[in-house]
Amino acid sequence: ELMETCPHGQLKVPSVGGGTANTEFEVLTGMSLDYFGPGEYPYKTILQQSTCESIAYNLKELGFGTHVIHNNTGTFYDRHLVFPNLGFDSFTSLEYMNHVDKNPLGWAKDTILTTEIIKSLLSTDQRDFVYAISVQPHGKYPSSPLGDEHPITVSSDVISEQDLVPFSYYVNQLYEEDAFLRSLIESLETYGEPTVLILYGDHLPSISAA
């Protein structure tokens, strides 16, 4: 539905199956990881001690408040140390969220992000840049059924029932992700200020069929 009504395109990212922080780095700074060492994470090697040009700093110069929201722990990838050096005024991580639902693998569901995004927008009188990082569909994906109900059934003529288990789990997490995005869009439409929503995927999932 969004692809039919909104601008969209392809995004080349430096990560597969993991490494969200490196995709974040490229998106926020415009710098390519090609200029860093093999396997390097700038969040680990540079940004804990040094600042770096970023879209957050650019928008701050234009009068925006800058906020990060992530429904995982703030110490993961040392984001709690990195984001101030990327120009963000505040960072709300899982530790500071209430009434968080979890998926069968224990990841926080992304529905909490809608609440936290609106809270950030309401926290200042200025224009705001809110960078939200979701976590719900993350792996490692199950190799055996978890017993939870799946509204979407996945079938294949070439993949075994056993190998379909992680695909089925992932597809149904995306189904919930669609519902979250609809809720977020509806909340932003009633927020009362002009809003630009940009969505991108950080990396493909680590799923394969034998």
Feature-to-residue mapping (PLM):
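Solvent-exposed soluble domains appended to multi-pass membrane proteins
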Residues: 1-210
